[in-house]
Amino acid sequence: MKPKMKYSTNKISTAKWKNTASKALCFKLGKSQQKAKEACHVYFMKLRSGLMIKKEACYFRRETTKRPSLKTDRKHKRHLVLAACQQQSTVESFAFGISGVQKYTRALHDSSITGISPITEYLASLSTYNDQSVTFALEDESYEIYVEDLKKDEKKDKVLLSYYESQRPSSESGDGVDGKMLMVTLSPTKDFWLHANNKEHSVELHKCEKPLADQAFFVLHNRPSNCVSFECKTDPGVFIGVKDNHLALIEVDSSENLGTENILFKLSET
């Protein structure tokens, strides 16, 4: 007679079995799950002229959670991985002692212009220290630049100013971003930019393709009486000025007062 064999069987309910299987499956498929959350830090920097710079540094906080195993007694281990995102700088308000100029709304990310990206753009009218308007006229399929008095009902021409960070330290004069002075390009109409002709000491409108030549860039200086001046990037000490009712390049000696009236301009939204 064969001995009887005894078997010990633990009964598991159907509901409990399904629950256990579900947990095991989830653990197997999601052993290492990652969740990314974006975090941003915003701070503001007010320059001497009132130019308000908004700095926004964003990064992703990626949280990796390892599912517990039976051996670890369901202990959780977490670690944070910080992935830095590209820092964005935008000029939130532009005020060289004036109420501000109209903000050109579209954001720019065109890195093809001389290898740098513009910070922002503004559309403004350009006038002299004596409130004469800078106008642009199409004559014989080319543009001419004039400095003249306008009638009250005449509409002022607008110029699109694109702002860039220059390599010149902002400690010299004027305003800057991240320790560097600002420089601008000026475009009164599409595909045309003000261009410094250093040989002829003149300011001309050139139809250009990107990348723009260095002659199209001017270092921006903040001046008294709500004025600014534009210094040639390619020829330090030479500024855009007014001569015989036209724009011209004027050399200003460093020992002289850079506040001379013929190189001072005003920017306005009207």
Swiss-Prot record:
GO biological process, one term: macrophage differentiation
GO cellular component, one term: transport vesicle
Post-translational modification: The full-length protein can be released from cells and is able to signal via the IL1RL1/ST2 receptor. However, proteolytic processing by CELA1, CSTG/cathepsin G and ELANE/neutrophil elastase produces C-terminal peptides that are more active than the unprocessed full-length protein. May also be proteolytically processed by calpains. Proteolytic cleavage mediated by apoptotic caspases including CASP3 and CASP7 results in IL33 inactivation.
The keyword Nucleus is annotated on this UniProt entry: yes
InterPro entries noted in UniProt: IL-33, IL33_C
Gene Ontology MF term list: cytokine activity; interleukin-33 receptor binding
Propeptide regions on this chain: 1-94
Region (Interaction with RELA): 64-111
Pfam families attached to this UniProt entry: IL33_bt (PF15095)
Description of how the protein assembles with itself and partners: Forms a 1:1:1 heterotrimeric complex with its primary high-affinity receptor IL1RL1 and the coreceptor IL1RAP. Interacts with cargo receptor TMED10; the interaction mediates the translocation from the cytoplasm into the ERGIC (endoplasmic reticulum-Golgi intermediate compartment) and thereby secretion.
PANTHER family per UniProt: DVS27 PROTEIN, INTERLEUKIN-33
Domain characteristics, as noted in the entry: The homeodomain-like HTH domain mediates nuclear localization and heterochromatin association.
Function: Cytokine that binds to and signals through the IL1RL1/ST2 receptor which in turn activates NF-kappa-B and MAPK signaling pathways in target cells. Involved in the maturation of Th2 cells inducing the secretion of T-helper type 2-associated cytokines. Also involved in activation of mast cells, basophils, eosinophils and natural killer cells. Acts as a chemoattractant for Th2 cells, and may function as an 'alarmin', that amplifies immune responses during tissue injury. In quiescent endothelia the uncleaved form is constitutively and abundantly expressed, and acts as a chromatin-associated nuclear factor with transcriptional repressor properties, it may sequester nuclear NF-kappaB/RELA, lowering expression of its targets. This form is rapidely lost upon angiogenic or pro-inflammatory activation.
Protein name: Interleukin-33
Gene for this chain: IL33
